[in-house]
Amino acid sequence: MAKWLENAIFYEIYPQSFNDTNGDGIGDFQGIIEKLDYIKETGFNAIWMNPCFDSPFGDAGYDVRDYKKTAARYGTNEDIKRLFDECHKRDMHILLDLVPGHTSVEHEWFKKSMLPEINEYTDRYIWTSNIWEQPEGLNCIRGISDRDGSAGVNFFSSQ
């Protein structure tokens, strides 16, 4: 464990509702940057930011479409780099909420897992052996691909 974590006091931010600087009704990275001094002055030395990756937002950003790109509604990849830089200037740390347990059905990995041919993505998601099978306790979406089987979902059909 990193040494700084022993004394970390986290301020959790859901970017969508935090601070809107461009008037579109949605919080953004610039809005977080604007409030860093306030956050620091109130005694926090770390930020835990809820999902900010590219997403169709079927589940508040937890249905990630691309882990390498930030959600455009919050800003650009350059904007988030600036947010990290501004945190570091204030001796603050920032952690991003990463949800590796599921992705959006629009994620490239899921799309590749939908192919009928076996590939490196075939087993990255839970699929039944045929479209009619539904194991007890597993919600499934059927008929979404050429693959024979139904995809198991964690929460919503969008993930």
What would you call each of these model-derived segments?
Residues 1-33, 37, 41:
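Conserved structural scaffold segments of CAZyme catalytic domains across common CAZy folds
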Residues 28-36, 40, 78, 84, ...:
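Glycan-processing catalytic domains of CAZymes
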